[in-house]
Amino acid sequence: MKITILSLFPSIITPFFENSIMKKVVDKGIISYEVISIRDFSKDKHKRCDDVPYGGGAGMVLKVQPIVDALEYVNANSKTTIFVSPSGLKYTQKLAYDLSKKDELVIICGRYEGLDQRVIDLYVDLEISVGDYVLSSGEVAALVIIDSVYRLLDGVINPNSLCEESFSFECGLLEYPHYTRPYEFRNLKVPDVLLSGHHEEIKKWRLVKSVEKTKKNRFDLYLKYLEMRGEKNDGFDKKN
């Protein structure tokens, strides 16, 4: 897979590819990347890439010309082009899986109040929001997408590990609690079942804890889990 990122601040993006697991993935050739500075394509003598919005309003808007020129430079029409935006589709694990099947991604990092709509009309295949909150940097949102996608590629993470994720797409539950040595710390002990050696009992315990955590922290996922199993809500709200 090749990932191309268009950004006003490439120095935020580049270190991500040069450290930890991602560096190994790049070195193995599983992923290649290119970080494009939008400013390099600005025709303004001061390399400005934003301007005031038509119709008035607060803030500045990213101009169409530098971004379209950058997109044409990377031949974005032949690739899946994403704009990270609070107005986009809510990002999910399923969408991460879908994106991991693409050969090439182009990600436009937003800034300021937004992006000239004509860029979206001409080039963007997907607008994606990473959550119901506001970020000052589209680069942060882009890294969320990249991180969630690359780990799904063949050869990055052991398939058995992917089956026991913090969020399991397959079963729709949050992950169970984890413990390691020491057995006791400040009077808190590891649950005995985890030391029992009875794998079926351990599996049952983990499922129960996953359901409990999902009900407490993500009641929406808990309801989907019940629906998937053909069960109904037990009548308790998420505070119970």
UniProtKB/Swiss-Prot annotation:
Its main location: cytoplasm. It is found in: Cytoplasm. The keyword Isomerase does not apply. S-adenosyl-L-methionine binds at G110, V130, G131, D132, Y133, V134, L135. CDD domains: TrmD-like. It comes from the Bacteria. InterPro entries: Alpha/beta_knot_MTases (IPR029028), tRNA_m1G_MeTrfase_C_sf (IPR023148), tRNA_m1G_MeTrfase_TrmD (IPR002649), tRNA_m1G_MTases_N (IPR029026), tRNA_MeTrfase_TRMD/TRM10 (IPR016009). GO terms for cellular component: cytosol. Keywords: Cytoplasm, Methyltransferase, S-adenosyl-L-methionine, Transferase, tRNA processing. One of its GO terms (molecular function) is tRNA (guanine(37)-N1)-methyltransferase activity. It catalyses: guanosine(37) in tRNA + S-adenosyl-L-methionine = N(1)-methylguanosine(37) in tRNA + S-adenosyl-L-homocysteine + H(+). It is an enzyme of class 2 (transferase). Its EC number is 2.1.1.228. The keyword S-adenosyl-L-methionine applies. GO terms for biological process: tRNA N1-guanine methylation. Homodimer. Specifically methylates guanosine-37 in various tRNAs. Belongs to the RNA methyltransferase TrmD family. This is tRNA (guanine-N(1)-)-methyltransferase. It comes from Borrelia duttonii (strain Ly).
